[in-house]
Amino acid sequence: MCIRDRYEALKTLALKSAKDFLALYESIPDKNAAAAPERKTFYGKVPCTANEMYEHTKNVNTYYFAEIAVEADHDGNIYECRKRGFESLESNPDFLQNTVRKGSYGEDWSLRKVLRRFIWHDRIHAKAMYRMAIKVFGAENVVNPFYF
């Protein structure tokens, strides 16, 4: 499989993941309900409601793309902003070089890493959102596009 095909496959998964995350979020009857009390870690407040989980997951769009020097935003829904981020990325003729860049906190980042991270990050927060939602609303009232 050539580099472009691998990129397109991972991009397709990252966009599907964003669509699935949005579908899960939109299916939750009360986006401000929580199944557990608020708590904090050394990272800060843990997202407890569907709205908090959604906003957190959507808003990393700018962070992940910035780690590979791509201008992006988190305006609109998670799918729309991620799609625009890929469009911005693809406007650079050398985007498939998979250049490794030193990102914030001294961490190495590449296009492949960003693609994998989108999928991983969506999944961990979708699982938390789904678990919270079925506790509060029941599995029959929430979609499960990730097949948890």
Region locations from a protein language model:
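Short, small-residue-biased leader/transition segments that mark boundaries at the very start
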Residues: 1-3
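Acidic/histidine-rich alpha-helical segments that form the ligand environment
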Residues: 6-27, 73-104, 109-128
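Short, contiguous alpha-helical
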Residues: 31-79, 104-148
